[in-house]
A protein has these predicted regions:
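Conserved cytochrome P450 K-helix/beta-meander segment immediately N-terminal to the heme-binding cysteine loop
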Residues: 349-376
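Conserved cytochrome P450 K-helix E-x-x-R motif and the immediately C-terminal K′/meander segment
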Residues: 19-42, 211, 215, 296-337
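Conserved, non-catalytic sequence blocks in retroelement Pol enzymes and Pol-derived host proteins
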Residues: 111, 221, 225, 300-307, ...
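Cytochrome P450 catalytic-core helices
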Residues: 264-289, 397-413
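Cytochrome P450 heme-thiolate monooxygenase catalytic core
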Residues: 1-11, 73-79, 97, 113-267, ...
Length: 444
């Protein structure tokens, strides 16, 4: 290990290379070991000229994401590496381009607009839950994936005749994600991936996804139909000069919303159900709350009454944040907590570690939804980031939370869930996934 100028330990490229197989499979233990050894912030020399700093320090993270966010953009990990597979949109852009498109897309996710999508959500969720048979064991991860997939597909396109094409789109995004992870975690071998044609093969898949979406958009425009879905909202969105998005931009935004809109939700739902299965006391409290709610009336009103259900989801996302690492790159040299960091320093901020830090949380490894009942939720604002923070906070956070509250509420109103597992095995890819979540369902 090397000492940096400002006394921050630097993990050498040799150490990274020695641990490459572990890192490729699951980087979280490697992160944790280094945080335990070297403190809340350390550097990693990946051997390709990059300056990478890992941190779980709450003050540092708040400074980068909120207080001085103008000096920090998303790094090339997203704008270039991820962007080449899913296009240039809200998730993969910076600066003026991002600001203009955020202003265009944001209105589609206002609570007033989302109220019109709640019926679509509810119908999609109920339809998928019919697959659950009483007194059976299920791996809920694929089940939650199917629910989230149907919700985002119906909310985007409100059409039942697209299922086959949507499945193909899902296959492409999952395949490309695995390739992207290989590139990110093994930067030494990018030249080899290019030489073997692996990257080229996956870029062809991205082109197929774009062509598929282009066809769907053409069909919508040709039909002349007006539907109160997200695609319609994007088609009607206008720049300040009154012009619509270009076709390519529309395709990119739709692909990004599709990709980001179901995977993270499925992950959070799976972890929430597992934790409630492990903690029947909290599960029963959710059941009591849900039993008093009428889902056949005003769905927004129903969701607003499920506060403890929401607390359980919030606590699950603390322990298992879907976006477990957030990246930024500094535009100019900056001083953070008394230390100077050069321009172009890449910051990797571990939400997984921050959300389990004893200086921020009492009994951090314990599942305790009550912690989100007590006092003002703003007190967590400096160290709880399930949807990111600052101007780059996830545009779909309300959409995701409404959906998750409905799913958990509807399941636990009808079923008890149990588990024999003490812990769930995790699979950190672009988002934090469980490997499998086998639960026992029994009718109430």
């Amino acid at each position: 290990m090397e000492k940096a100028v400002n006394e921050i330990v630097t993990v050498s490229p040799i150490e990274v290379f020695k641990n490459r197989k572990r890192i490729l499979k699951n980087p979280l233990p490697f992160h944790h070991e280094n945080f335990e050894k070297y403190g809340d912030t350390f550097k990693v020399n990946i051997g390709v000229g990059g300056k990478v700093v890992f941190t779980k320090d709450a003050e540092t993270i708040q400074y980068i994401l909120q207080k001085n966010h103008k000096n920090y953009h998303k790094s090339s990990l997203q704008t270039k590496d991820l962007g080449k597979y899913i296009g240039r949109g809200l998730l993969t852009s910076n600066g003026g381009f991002w600001r203009v498109h955020r202003r265009m897309v944001q209105p589609a996710f206002h609570k007033r607009k989302l109220q019109g999508l709640l019926g679509v959500m509810f119908k999609s969720i109920e339809q998928e839950l019919k697959r659950i048979k009483e007194d059976r064991d299920y791996d809920v991860f694929p089940l939650m994936g199917d629910i989230a997939f149907q919700v985002v597909a119906q909310s985007l396109f409100s059409a039942d005749n697209l299922r086959k094409r949507m499945r193909r789109l899902q296959e492409i995004t999952e395949t490309n994600q695995k390739m992207l992870i290989k590139e990110m975690r093994q930067p030494f071998f990018k030249w080899w991936f290019h030489l073997k044609g692996e990257i080229g093969k996956h870029l062809k898949l991205s082109k197929e996804a774009q062509e598929l979406l282009d066809t769907i958009i053409n069909e919508r425009i040709s039909s002349g139909a007006e539907k109160d879905d997200l695609l319609d909202m994007l088609l009607q969105a206008r720049y300040e000069d009154g012009t619509p998005m270009s076709r390519q931009q529309l395709i990119d935004e739709v692909l990004i919303l599709f990709t980001a809109g179901h995977e993270t939700t499925a992950n959070a739902l799976s972890f929430t159900l597992f934790l409630l299965a492990k903690n029947p006391k909290f599960q029963e409290e959710v059941f009591k709350e849900v039993s008093k709610v009428d889902f056949s009336a005003d769905l927004m009103e129903a969701i607003s009454q499920l506060n403890f259900t929401k607390n359980c989801i919030e606590e699950a996302m603390r322990l298992y944040p879907p976006v477990y690492v957030i990246d930024r790159v500094s535009l100019e040299t900056d001083k953070v907590k008394g230390r100077t960091y050069e321009k172009d320093t890449v910051w990797l901020m571990s939400m997984y570690e921050l959300h389990r830090t004893e200086t921020c949380w009492k009994d951090p490894e314990k599942f305790d939804p009550y912690r989100f009942q007590k006092g003002d939720p703003k007190r967590y604002a400096s160290y709880y980031y399930p949807f990111g923070a600052g101007p780059r906070m996830c545009v779909g956070n309300n959409f995701a939370m409404f959906e998750m509250v409905l799913v958990i509420g509807l399941i636990l109103k009808k079923y008890k869930v149990g588990t024999q597992m003490r812990e769930v095995a995790i699979n950190p890819l672009i988002s934090l996934k469980p490997k499998s979540v086998p639960l026992q369902f029994s009718m109430r």
